[in-house]
Design a protein with these regions (language model features):
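N-terminal Rossmann-like FAD-binding beta1-loop-alpha1 element of flavoenzymes
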Residues: 2-28, 430
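Short loop/edge segments at beta-strand edges and connector loops
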Residues: 7, 79-81, 223-225, 231, ...
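Conserved Rossmann-like nucleotide-cofactor binding loop
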Residues: 11, 34, 258
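Glycine-rich FAD pyrophosphate-binding loop
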Residues: 20-44
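Mid-domain catalytic core of redox enzymes
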Residues: 22, 228-349, 362, 442-450
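Dinucleotide-binding Rossmann-like beta1-alpha1 core, especially the glycine-rich loop
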Residues: 45-132, 137-140
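Conserved flavin/dinucleotide-binding core of flavoenzymes
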Residues: 98, 316-450
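Active-site/ligand-binding neighborhood in enzyme catalytic cores
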Residues: 124-230, 234-236
């Protein structure tokens, strides 16, 4: 079978990789001149700057880990201990480790009564039915009952647990008020906190897509080739891209949902394209403040997170600690990641100024940076508000035969959600009956090498 995959981010690359393992002929179309999407790296003056995704998350990324092991790349991942400072409103700082949720309980700002309340809440969640996979949209939908994360957190962890754990933690990951979010993901993370372990590929998260493409022999990769149209053609489809028409038997559509809606407009009902276009996205910005000589070589913490949303920014991250190869020898870069609500009133110049002020607040005086690099996306991260998972998951049954969707937006913005979705789309295409759980090793064992 000849299959077109539209979109060269992690979802599309994972779909192409899986389809080739199954013996299909695959054409992968990517509008940019490289694969990776929002995981891509930008190389500038000796720095390798991430355009979006920052890290992988250990045991809660089972499909990413499994594929990297198949590719022989898993052992190349570099552990990141992510020592974290929580900044209180009055300037006091408390230390924790981002990948060890229970380490937040050591913060002295939490009373013994508060710590017991949080520990009891976590213990209850461990024995309460909940999602076992953090990035399976169908499973998350089963535990999305309409409550939002703020009310859930205050009920389960209490006021201080919400202020000093949930707000900084989820503020870093998704940069929006926790009242905007369904609690299903955080519920899943709390249930699996012991499996968290942060890692980074040596060349940055964008290297995951490079590894997938390199590990997909026979892939027909078409870079700088945006797809203009998908039309029915007999028992298959014609994909129009780069001024050429490509007849295929099936299509996996893996760009962001607004682009997917445009491509599917003549193939599906208006209700389906509306669901795609209504998928909530955040205004997203981060600034890399780059120094060729590190002004703070003795600063220990990798991450600084505010314990409230009173600042414009939600995280500062030292690049030399997260990805040592990404800075020139003796250099440093600070990634300043912004909350979504303030961006509505901020120009790009305002964002850069606020980033420089954040660097001063967190790390202290420094000479002028050698350069700053702003990444600003009006449609940045997909936001899973209450009801999101069920609405998006229902789309799979609404696609015509031979058309499959993939993307992290079915769960939450993130590499695992994208890879899970891309692999699942390929398995759906390959199976006349509902596919086996894509986490199952049987899927890999049964795969036919091309």
């Amino acid at each position: 079978m000849k299959v077109a995959v539209v979109g060269g981010g992690p979802a599309g690359c994972a779909a192409a990789y899986t389809l080739r393992k199954q013996g299909h002929e695959v054409v992968l179309f990517e509008a940019q001149d490289h694969v990776g999407g929002r995981t891509s790296q930008v190389l500038k003056e000796g720095f390798s700057l991430g355009s979006g995704a920052l890290f992988l998350m250990g045991g809660i990324y089972p499909r990413t880990n499994a594929i990297l092991k198949e590719l022989g790349c898993y052992r190349e991942l570099i552990p990141w201990d992510a020592e974290t400072e929580i900044l209180d409103a009055d300037g006091r700082r408390y230390t924790a480790k981002f990948d060890q949720v229970m380490s937040f309980l050591r913060m002295p700002v939490l009373s013994w009564r508060g710590k017991l309340r949080i520990a009891a809440g976590v213990a209850r969640e461990l024995v309460t039915p909940g999602p076992k996979l953090c990035f399976d949209g169908a499973e998350l939908a089963r535990f999305d009952d309409g409550e939002n994360l703020e009310t859930w957190s205050r009920r389960v962890l209490g006021e201080r647990g919400t202020t000093y754990i949930t707000v900084p933690y989820m503020g870093f990951l998704y940069a929006v008020p926790i009242s905007w979010l369904s609690p299903a993901l955080f519920h899943a993370v709390v249930k699996q906190f012991y499996r968290l372990a942060l890692t980074v590929p040596p060349k940055g998260v964008g290297q995951v897509c490079d590894w997938l493409v390199e590990g997909t022999p026979g892939l027909d990769l078409r870079l700088s080739t945006p797809v203009d149209k998908i039309t029915p053609d007999g028992a298959g489809f014609t994909v129009t891209a780069g001024g050429e028409r490509h007849p295929v038997d099936a299509v996996i559509v893996a760009p962001e949902p607004g682009v997917a809606a445009d491509l599917l407009e003549d193939l599906v009902e208006p209700e389906s394209t509306k669901k795609l276009r209504d998928c909530m996205y955040s205004d997203y910005a981060h600034v890399q403040v780059c120094f060729k000589r590190n002004p703070w070589p003795k600063h220990r913490a990798s991450v600084a997170l505010p314990a409230n949303m009173e600042r414009d920014w939600g995280a500062c991250v030292l690049l030399s600690k997260r990805q040592p190869s990404a800075v020139p020898e003796g250099g440093e870069a600070v990634g300043v990641y912004f909350y979504t609500p303030p961006l509505e009133r901020m120009s790009d110049a305002d964002i850069i100024k606020s980033a420089l002020n954040a660097v001063l607040e967190v790390y202290g005086p420094a000479p002028d940076p050698d350069f700053v690099e702003l990444f600003h996306y009006r449609r940045g991260l997909s936001i899973a508000n209450p009801g999101h998972y069920g609405t998006l998951d229902s789309l799979h049954a609404e696609m015509p035969p031979g058309v499959y969707l993939a993307g992290d937006y079915f769960a939450h913005a993130g590499v695992e959600a994208a890879i899970f979705s891309g692999e699942l789309a390929a398995n759906r295409l390959n199976a006349p009956t509902p596919p086996a759980d894509p986490q199952s090793p049987a899927d890999t064992a049964a795969a036919v090498k091309p």
